[in-house]
């Protein structure tokens, strides 16, 4: 019992979740600007750096949460849920950075409509993740819990939209692009962008579990 008394009882987990979600949105929006300004090399490099900075900041929050889990005697929600949520969120930030790095590495000729649409859906998913995460500290209010669940449903719908865009993009790519190298590049980018929305759906699933168990 003495050991438990020496440890903090809760820790500021919800605030750190919010900080991480903000960094995810920053990374997603910076990536969207990278796509929108792809033909401007200087702007493209600047937004690539912005993505990197946001991802590194998110990574620091993840490490702090994982450290705090082991230092906190009583956590506000289950430790496994905390660990799963923050690490799944961090996967989203990593995928956004991977997408930006892949874009730079492959030097795609130009942005396609499908990249723009998938990017837009990714940004919307990340924004909904931030919205849902912001509600986790207020689950004692039934209306807040219901709002969190509805936001998770929105993320699911956005992920389904991304699936449809992805299938259409692949069909068009194999049908119309004569350059095999460009096919390989675009296929990899489409898959990464769609995976961002998949991972946001994974975050939504974790949040749904937290809401149902703690409201």
Which positions does each model-derived feature cover?
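Cytosolic, long alpha-helical scaffolding segments
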Residues: 1-215
